Amino acid sequence: MGDRAHHDSVRRSYDTVAEEYATRLHGEFTEKPLDRALLAALLEQTEPGSPIADLGCGPGHLAAWLADRGARTVGIDLSAGMVEAGRARFAQVEFREGDLLELPAEDGEFGSAVAFYTIIHLDPADLRRAVEEARRVLRPAGLLLLAFHVGEEVRHLDEWWGHDVDIDFRFLEPAHVAGLLEAAGFAVEMRMERTHYAHEAETRRAYLLARRI
């Protein structure tokens, strides 16, 4: 991220909550029918055998959900604590520690990629670069599925489940994100929004599906 201090605070914050995050959110996709449907559709559209990247994977719940349905998944996260938590829980997923702005992956390595509530931690100046980096690691015609909170506000946490943290959650406008995707060499194929589920924070959610062109 553009500001090194900001970058480090995100990493430290997720390191701090990694174990509790992994425990509290285990099995969360059983209560998110739209998320499951979109991920299943992505899996169907990914060339068989092509790996799928989970960018900002946390402890790997989403990556494991895909792996359990036959996908070869690679989870990438900035937080060493999250990567460690994922490796301890999900042997079916390959985990790598890495930055959205400099992904530890080869050009064109992945058939598809997902980034659920990942770009919300980026400095606004870095969003374009992150999208370009996602495009770099995708194969031609590869798909990128994004999820994020809708709006223009920034929510700051200095305490999370009783742990001291220092982290911002940046809400984003779908039209702005779609414009960044198109400028970076993607064609946006789907935009969708939903309200929060009962167990979630009370925010509106957006999903964008884009294809590398």
Language model features: what each stretch is:
Residues 128-140:
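A short glycine-rich, Lys/Arg-flanked "PGG" loop and its adjoining helix->strand segment in the class I
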Residues 141-148:
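Conserved beta-strand signature within the Rossmann-like core of class I S-adenosyl-L-methionine
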Residues 169-184:
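Short alpha-helix
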Residues 51-55, 59-102:
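Class I SAM-dependent methyltransferase SAM/SAH-binding core
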Residues 197-213:
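Core SAM-dependent methyltransferase catalytic element
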Residues 150-168:
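Short, glycine-/aromatic-enriched active-site segment of Class I SAM-dependent methyltransferases
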Residues 101-113:
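A short acidic, Gly/Pro-enriched loop at the edge of an enzyme's catalytic core
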Residues 1-47, 152:
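Conserved class I S-adenosyl-L-methionine
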